[in-house]
A protein has these predicted regions:
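A short, N-terminal "cap"/entry segment at the start of jelly-roll beta-barrel domains
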Residues: 1-22, 32, 99-121
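A cytosolic small-molecule/anion-sensing beta-strand core signal
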Residues: 45-46, 62, 80
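Short, conserved beta-strand element in jelly-roll/cupin
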Residues: 35-51
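Catalytic core of non-heme Fe(II) oxygenases with the double-stranded beta-helix
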Residues: 28-35
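Short acidic-glycine-tyrosine-enriched beta hairpin
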Residues: 55-71
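Ligand-binding loop in jelly-roll beta-barrel domains
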Residues: 50, 70-97
């Protein structure tokens, strides 16, 4: 039976996603460089943009999909009003729910190590 998923992303334990949505972005909008503790998929429905993932530039347009692996830095600059679908993959145990930033948030291995240290104290 289908399950209605409330906004707070309360997914059942068997789910292979931890978040998804539709973005409506305007020319000049930018998604700042960031990373996640899970994989992310962007599917472009309409519009154009320039993405950077792990330092590699990609031009995105309708029908394109950009896959970013957990821990990969990525960003987007919108060059034509854009509608896209984003989908977040499985969040590992102790994963963090947000855009994570270099110099502010620990990379995944260091994040796990900090949890282990706290647990041992």
């Amino acid at each position: 039976m289908p399950k209605k998923i409330p906004w707070q992303m309360d997914f059942p334990p068997w789910s292979e996603t931890n978040g998804f949505g539709i973005s409506h972005l305007k020319v000049g909008d930018e998604v700042e460089p960031h990373f996640h503790d899970c994989n992310e998929y962007w599917i472009i429905i309409s519009g154009q943009g320039e993405a950077i993932s792990e330092g590699q530039p990609y031009h995105l347009g309708p029908g394109d999909m950009l896959l970013t692996e957990a821990g990969q830095y990525h960003s987007l600059e919108v060059t034509e009003d854009m509608v896209s679908v984003y989908y977040y993959g499985v969040m590992p145990e102790h994963g963090r729910w947000s855009h994570l930033h270099e110099g502010v948030d620990l990379p995944w291995a260091e994040h796990l190590a900090s949890i282990a240290v706290k647990a041992a104290q």
